[in-house]
């Protein structure tokens, strides 16, 4: 203890005088004490003035001490005075220990500031004797901090208690008073010692090894303050001014923590402690708080009438802090609140349970009602379904009747194009498209493309051709790669047409039977009606005969002989003659409902397909005959006249300028390039049956003559393509709508396979998907063999070559390894397409119409590479002007455009004019 006191005295001696005089005034008071520091500049010896508390009966007994540093002393006296001071402190502690309260702590380990003289027993002699020794100590250490505390304790209780309190304060040393509270207050602080030991450590920066749980708050506070002062003095001995501030600040913080945390179970930081102290002062400034604490069983010594004295912050804070039941009150309040919450929760749970039960009951009722409603609805739905089924059956029957009447008046597309239907299981693809169908005339909407509904198949988007992997196979299409289950040129995926033609082949036999039944019934009705007419006529004749006989009997017998023989056969011959034309007229129940197509001799335009299509073995020498020879045996194109000049079969014919092997008759009057009838160029890729998917041109009669509009050889397809299936309609009448196959002869395809045939010429624009050459405004006459089907509008070639250029540009982007390479003589670029994904070229083909005129000179290649150079597309004036130019006969005529005389146009019958299908 002596060594510690010596160290602390030496360390604290390094603090300057002025620092003590300025900063120590700011020390925070303890709960029951006020620190008064006075500095006297005089060099007189230090006088310790203490008022004896025994004789003082006043409300407060302040003890004022003033420590004045002496001016001159010796070091020997300093040491002697220090030891004597320590001895007197220990002796006084031993004296005061039995009389102090049981809670008075042990001797201090490190007294805070032994700089100041001790507060001793009422004998002031010891203090006066120790003053000069203390003066010597202060002389050696030039600075001292003298602190003197006067615990202001208002006394209004009996004098004995006051005497006890004052005696306790006397017995305690002057600086140890910081570590203790009055003995009466220690009783209330014992409960909080454990918490305070931990809470005070937060503000101290030194070792806080205060494990004395029995010590009071002052004890802990002094230890901490001493440690802080020691460390700060050691570390900061050079900075004297800062040391003063550090000491005082540490004292302030620790004192505040001690008082604030005395009753708090939760640790408080020094910043929050000071804030709470201020807030608590404001909360507890009312005098009612002291009265409530007095009535709560606190010791009366602690709750004296301290409001009568001058209140300090420590009084308010300690008074509020040391309510021992505050924590219990808070617990009681919390428990009460928890009970209230529990009650509320229980009530809520009960209410929820009730609500759930009610809801369950309601739900059960609702479910029962819903089940009943569902049962009723199911019954109603079943009834409605039955009604709907009945209605659907009726509607289907009506639709079947309407379809038979409406949709099947024109020739069915499966037999026009002879490509597989969805129900045909992939049929034969080698059958030429031999017939014309009126749905396919326009380039819009009804363009007969593939069935797939991808956006690239829209009619306005031009398609790049899908070049088949086998360019010389017989079953290739100009538009799609051969897939055996695809409808090539049938109607597009329009619901109305699908509904009309999906179940066509299934219904076809039924339709034939119904048609035959209807025809038979009509024949029977006609026969019955004719019989009735005959009976009526016979009765009339008999009556007339009787009358005539009566008259003739009166007249001469010669007149009777002369009049009677002609009269009976004449009425009999009339019904025979009237009935005979009616029977064939009644058989075609379905006729093409187009104003431009009329019956020709009542049998020519019957839509019932002939059992002998143009490639049937019955017509081996004329596969391209538009008219069957059975109907008009006197036609100049009958097989009996195979080598007639009207049927040019010479192989030299394709070399004629009328037959450029590029099928482009640029000035042909039969194809306006942008007319709605304009379709697509044929597939001339060569090999067998390269015309499989081309459209047909019906015959055009001129008077009684039938023109063969095809100039290719007769025997070109009689062997290559198989005979198509027999058409579904009545085999009694052969249709006059026969195709004009637009292909060169296979001989030419073999010889010129290098130049033009090898290039897959597949049109791309939506305008040339299908060429229907039957829409020519003025078909050629029968006498000219060279106005034949092989002229194709030059615009086809423009489109195809522009597509070549576009494909060449696009394939730089579409670096597709699967694209097949072909060389097209009509353009200087490689014609690259991909079977899989070359359709990306479609996007650039929309500009083909603008580029047509730029590529005219490179587009027309005849078989012998004779280029027909045309500068522009034929206009309507050109097309109409060529109608009046004479034509030349012969296979090698020099004219490059088909000529059409006006005589034939003027001499055409009205029925044949209606068959021109002009626009």
UniProtKB/Swiss-Prot annotation:
Residues 1-15, 34-75, 96-107, 141-153, 186-292, 450-471, 553-564, 573-589, 618-635, 712-723, 798-863 have a biased composition (Low complexity). Residues 1-167, 179-312, 415-491, 553-739, 751-863, 883-906 are annotated as: Disordered. Residues 16-25, 420-433, 678-695, 754-768, 883-899 have a biased composition (Polar residues). Residues 154-167, 785-797 have a biased composition (Basic and acidic residues). This is Putative uncharacterized protein DDB_G0291608. It comes from Dictyostelium discoideum (Social amoeba). The lineage of its organism: Eukaryota, Amoebozoa, Evosea, Eumycetozoa, Dictyostelia.
């Amino acid at each position: 203890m002596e060594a510690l006191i010596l160290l602390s005295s030496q360390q604290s001696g390094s603090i300057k005088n002025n620092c003590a005089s300025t900063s120590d005034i700011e020390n925070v008071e303890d709960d029951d004490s006020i620190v008064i520091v006075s500095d006297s500049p005089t060099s007189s010896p230090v006088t310790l003035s203490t008022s004896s508390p025994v004789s003082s009966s006043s409300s407060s007994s302040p003890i004022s001490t003033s420590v004045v540093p002496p001016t001159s002393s010796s070091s020997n006296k300093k040491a002697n005075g220090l030891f004597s001071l320590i001895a007197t402190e220990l002796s006084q502690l031993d004296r005061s220990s039995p009389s102090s309260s049981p809670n008075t702590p042990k001797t201090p380990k490190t007294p805070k500031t032994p700089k100041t003289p001790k507060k001793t027993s009422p004998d002031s002699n010891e203090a006066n004797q120790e003053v000069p020794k203390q003066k010597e100590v202060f002389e050696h250490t030039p600075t001292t901090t003298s602190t003197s505390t006067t615990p202001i304790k208002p006394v209004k209780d009996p004098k004995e208690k006051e005497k006890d309190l004052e005696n306790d304060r006397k017995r305690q040393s002057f600086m140890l008073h910081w570590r203790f509270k009055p003995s009466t207050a220690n009783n209330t602080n014992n409960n909080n010692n454990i918490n305070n030991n931990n809470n005070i450590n937060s503000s101290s920066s030194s070792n806080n090894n205060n494990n004395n749980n029995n010590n009071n708050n002052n004890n802990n506070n002094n230890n901490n303050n001493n440690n802080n002062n020691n460390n700060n003095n050691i570390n900061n001995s050079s900075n004297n001014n800062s040391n003063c501030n550090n000491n005082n600040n540490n004292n302030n913080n620790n004192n505040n923590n001690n008082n604030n945390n005395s009753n708090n179970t939760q640790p408080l930081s020094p910043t929050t402690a000071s804030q709470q102290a201020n807030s608590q002062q404001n909360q507890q400034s009312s005098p009612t708080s002291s009265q409530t604490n007095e009535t709560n069983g606190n010791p009366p010594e602690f709750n004296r009438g301290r409001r009568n004295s001058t209140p300090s912050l420590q009084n308010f804070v300690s008074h509020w802090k040391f309510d021992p039941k505050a924590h219990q009150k808070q617990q009681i309040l919390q428990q009460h609140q928890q009970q209230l919450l529990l009650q509320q929760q229980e009530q809520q749970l009960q209410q929820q349970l009730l609500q759930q039960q009610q809801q369950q009951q309601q739900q059960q009722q609702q479910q029962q009602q819903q089940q009943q409603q569902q049962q009723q609805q199911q019954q109603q739905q079943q009834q409605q379904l039955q009604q709907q089924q009945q209605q659907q059956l009726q509607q289907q029957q009506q639709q079947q009747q309407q379809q038979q009447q409406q949709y099947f008046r024109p020739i069915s597309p499966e037999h026009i194009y002879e490509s597989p239907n969805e129900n045909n299981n992939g049929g034969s693809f080698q059958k030429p498209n031999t017939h014309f169908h009126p749905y396919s005339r326009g380039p819009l909407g009804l363009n007969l493309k593939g069935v797939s509904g991808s956006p690239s198949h829209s009619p306005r988007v031009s398609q790049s051709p899908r070049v088949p992997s086998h360019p010389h196979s017989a079953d290739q299409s100009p538009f799609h790669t051969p897939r055996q289950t695809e409808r090539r040129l049938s109607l597009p995926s329009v619901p109305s047409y699908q509904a009309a033609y999906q179940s066509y082949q299934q219904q076809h036999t039924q339709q034939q039977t119904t048609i035959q039944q209807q025809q038979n019934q009509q024949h029977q009705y006609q026969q019955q009606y004719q019989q009735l007419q005959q009976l009526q006529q016979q009765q009339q004749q008999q009556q007339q005969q009787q009358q005539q006989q009566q008259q003739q009997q009166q007249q001469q017998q010669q007149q009777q002989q002369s009049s009677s023989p002609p009269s009976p056969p004449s009425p009999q011959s009339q019904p025979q003659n009237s009935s005979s034309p009616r029977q064939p007229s009644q058989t075609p129940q379905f006729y093409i409902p187009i104003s431009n197509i009329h019956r020709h001799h009542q049998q020519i335009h019957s839509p019932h397909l002939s059992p002998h299509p143009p490639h049937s073995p019955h017509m081996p020498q004329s596969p391209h005959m538009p008219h069957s020879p059975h109907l008009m045996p006197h036609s100049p194109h009958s097989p009996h006249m195979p080598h007639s000049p009207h049927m040019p079969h010479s192989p030299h014919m394709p070399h004629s300028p009328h037959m450029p092997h590029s099928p482009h008759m640029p000035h042909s009057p039969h194809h306006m390039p942008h007319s709605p009838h304009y379709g697509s160029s044929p597939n001339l890729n060569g090999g067998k049956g390269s015309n499989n998917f081309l459209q047909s041109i019906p015959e055009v009669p001129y008077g009684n003559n039938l023109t063969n509009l095809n100039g290719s050889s007769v025997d070109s397809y009689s062997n290559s393509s198989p005979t198509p299936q027999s058409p579904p309609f009545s085999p009694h009448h052969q249709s006059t709508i026969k195709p004009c196959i637009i292909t060169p002869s296979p001989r030419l395809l073999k010889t010129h396979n290098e130049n033009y045939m090898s290039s897959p010429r597949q049109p791309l624009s939506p305008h040339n998907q299908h060429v229907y050459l039957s829409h020519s405004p003025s078909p050629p006459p029968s006498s000219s063999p060279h106005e034949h089907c092989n002229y194709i509008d030059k615009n086809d070639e423009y489109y195809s070559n522009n597509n070549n250029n576009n494909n060449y540009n696009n394939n730089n982007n579409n670096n597709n390894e699967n694209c097949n390479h072909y060389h097209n003589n009509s353009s200087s670029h490689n014609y690259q397409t991909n079977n899989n994904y070359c359709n990306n070229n479609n996007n650039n083909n929309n500009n083909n119409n603008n580029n047509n005129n730029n590529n005219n000179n490179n587009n027309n290649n005849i078989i012998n590479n004779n280029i027909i150079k045309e500068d522009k597309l034929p206009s309507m004036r050109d097309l109409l002007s060529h109608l009046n130019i004479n034509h030349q006969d012969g296979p090698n005529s020099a004219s490059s455009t088909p000529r059409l005389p006006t005589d034939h146009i003027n001499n055409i019958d009205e029925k044949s004019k209606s068959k021109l299908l002009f626009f």
